[in-house]
Amino acid sequence: MKKKGFQRSDRVAEQVRRDLADLIRTELKDPRVGMISLTAVELTPDYAHAKVFFATLNSEHLEEVERGLKRAAGFLRRELGKRIHIHTLPELHFVYDSSIERGASLSLLIDQANALSDQTPEE
């Protein structure tokens, strides 16, 4: 039987992402975390673990941001449990998402290639 639309785990992962983003923005007081964006959440099938992918505007302080998130993981999990009622609340693992930086560098390379082709005289 073909599954239509989102599976339950996809909906739960998206809800976890939204609630964590709200908790980080409103409840987390750690200045190391600052301006981050949660890009995705991947849950294991048993919901025991969640990879929370994040991006930050200031990648120079990436290690500090990761330490702040790791330190706040227990607090965030506890607060998440107050918002989401599922049998197993996932343990949070924060992972830096470098796809935005990779996309920007690829876009720059494409722009440079286009600029070179515009400068090359046509025969």
UniProtKB/Swiss-Prot annotation:
GO terms for molecular function: ribosomal small subunit binding. PANTHER family: RIBOSOME-BINDING FACTOR A, CHLOROPLASTIC-RELATED. It comes from Dechloromonas aromatica (strain RCB). One of several proteins that assist in the late maturation steps of the functional core of the 30S ribosomal subunit. Associates with free 30S ribosomal subunits (but not with 30S subunits that are part of 70S ribosomes or polysomes). Required for efficient processing of 16S rRNA. May interact with the 5'-terminal helix region of 16S rRNA. It is found in: Cytoplasm. Belongs to the RbfA family. GO terms for biological process: maturation of SSU-rRNA. Pfam families: RBFA. It comes from the Bacteria. Keywords: Cytoplasm, Ribosome biogenesis. Monomer. Binds 30S ribosomal subunits, but not 50S ribosomal subunits or 70S ribosomes. This is Ribosome-binding factor A. One of its GO terms (cellular component) is cytosol. HAMAP family: RbfA.
